Amino acid sequence: MYQEEFPYQIRWAEAEDWTPAMNMIWKTFMKFEGPEYTSEGIRNFLDFITDEDLFHSFLQGKYLMLVATDGAQIIGAASVRDGNHLSLLFVDERYHRQGVGKRLMSYLCEILKKEAGREDITLKAAPYAVPFYRKIGFWATGPEEHYSGIIVTPMRKRL
């Protein structure tokens, strides 16, 4: 079977990647998730991705993030906290349906299993992302939740 080579790079994020990654995340959030959230939810999401404590955790290696790049441009990002909880997964809309999100998740799951000895990964999926996560092997562990203006479905995947 012919399999096309993945044309983008996936690597650990560095300090200088933080701002461009968060800008891409914010832009993508506002396009695909923001319309379903209340103004409170949008504010809470923005507060989360601009939180200085989160940035410092990243700099200290406590908040891990992978980025996908096309040349020098960050086109996707995936981050994990608390050892095995996917905190953020976003792909620039121009790169949707090109395997970027799937590849980021594949790399992240492999790292969690082989290097960190984790048996599963959890996340709280926005409504827009639930079909994607189901397609890559996640299942809902509870009903859709609404809190602080944010809508999520708790999900899990065995590694």
Describe each PLM feature range:
Residues 9-23:
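A short beta-loop-alpha structural element at the N-terminal edge
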Residues 12, 120-124, 134, 139-154:
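Conserved catalytic-core motifs of GNAT/GCN5-like acyltransferases
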Residues 26-53:
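Conserved GNAT-fold acetyl-CoA-binding loop/helix
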Residues 51-66:
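A short helix-loop-beta-strand connector motif used in the catalytic cores of GNAT acetyltransferases and
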Residues 62-76:
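Conserved beta-hairpin
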